[in-house]
Structures are given as structure tokens and as C-alpha cells.
UniProtKB/Swiss-Prot annotation:
The gene is SPATA19. Essential for sperm motility and male fertility. Plays an important role in sperm motility by regulating the organization and function of the mitochondria and is also required for correct sperm midpiece assembly. It is found in: Mitochondrion outer membrane; Mitochondrion; Cell projection, Cilium, Flagellum. It holds the Pfam family SPATA19. InterPro entries: SPATA19 (IPR028219). The lineage of its organism: Eukaryota, Metazoa, Chordata, Craniata, Vertebrata. GO terms for biological process: cell differentiation; sperm mitochondrion organization; spermatogenesis. GO terms for cellular component: mitochondrial outer membrane; sperm flagellum; sperm midpiece. This is Spermatogenesis-associated protein 19, mitochondrial. It comes from the Eukaryota.
Length: 154
């Protein structure tokens, strides 16, 4: 159904003399530097918020001696959390670790722009493939109808 709708849309545009795909693209161009800067900003903000929350939790559970600065590392946090019994909810820890891993994977992902020629060529290939499929199906249907008509005449 979806393929048929697209084919009708494409054929209607071609019949009206309009190009497919339209020459004016509504897509917003994304460059790698913009994406990287957004990810870095978000990561920095998240790390600052997490560090602040951890410092607050540690200061309420283990108040530092006067004049001591609180330095937060993953090892210290895990050590204090396991001692204080805050790791009762293991599923939350697993979820946070998975989220962290996914974020790291996503932050290392590169964003590449596909040249419009390659995109147009891929679109033409796909349209041609769909046309061949439709022609093949219509040939099969017409052959089947001929066979039914020949059987009904007998």
C-alpha cells in the first residue's frame, strides 16, 4: 500500500511536469562540527550536574573534615555508595550504566552528509526496482486473468 502510494505520487509529479524529488529540500543541513559541539556541551552539563549531586549526597552521608575539598571519582562514589547501602536498587545502576555506554557510543558516531548525486542515484535505482516489481506483478495478474477466462470458456 505504501509503495503504491509513493508510485502514484511520483507518477503524478512527473505527469504534472514537476521533478521528483523536489529540487527545494526542506531538510536542515547538519554538519559534524555542530553535532559534536552540541554533544560536548550536553556531556559537560550532564557531568557537572551529576558531580554536583554526588557531592551533595556525599556531604550529607560523609561530611568532609573542615578545610577538606571533596573530590569525586567513580571509584570513590561506588565505594561510598556500596558502604552506605544506596546500591539497593541494582536495576537503576544497570540502567544508568547502559545509558552511559549508549551515550559514549553515540558521541563517537560520525555524521556524514550524503552527496545529493548519490541520494538521487539511490532514489532512481529504488524507483526503477519498484517499477520492475509492479510490472512483474501486473504481468502475473494479467496472465492469471487470461488463464481464468480460458478456463471459464471451457
Amino acid at each position: 500500500m505504501i509503495i503504491t502510494t509513493w508510485i502514484v505520487y511520483i507518477l503524478a509529479r512527473k505527469g504534472a511536469g514537476l521533478p521528483f524529488p523536489p529540487k527545494v529540500s526542506s531538510d536542515v543541513e547538519v554538519t559534524e562540527t555542530e553535532a559534536v559541539s552540541v554533544v560536548q556541551h550536553w556531556l559537560k552539563k550532564t557531568e557537572e550536574e551529576a558531580s554536583q549531586e554526588i557531592k551533595e549526597k556525599m556531604s550529607t552521608n560523609f561530611p568532609p573534615m573542615q578545610g577538606q575539598d571533596v573530590h569525586v571519582t567513580r571509584d570513590v562514589v561506588k565505594h561510598h555508595l556500596s558502604k552506605s547501602g544506596l546500591l539497593a536498587n541494582q536495576s537503576q545502576e544497570v540502567l544508568e550504566e547502559r545509558t552511559r555506554i549508549q551515550f559514549i557510543r553515540w558521541s563517537h558516531t560520525r555524521i556524514f552528509q550524503v552527496p545529493s548525486e548519490a541520494r538521487n542515484e539511490a532514489m532512481r535505482d529504488r524507483i526503477e526496482q519498484v517499477r520492475r516489481s509492479i510490472c512483474h506483478l501486473s504481468d502475473e495478474i494479467s496472465q492469471e486473468l487470461r488463464n481464468r477466462n480460458s478456463y471459464s470458456e471451457c
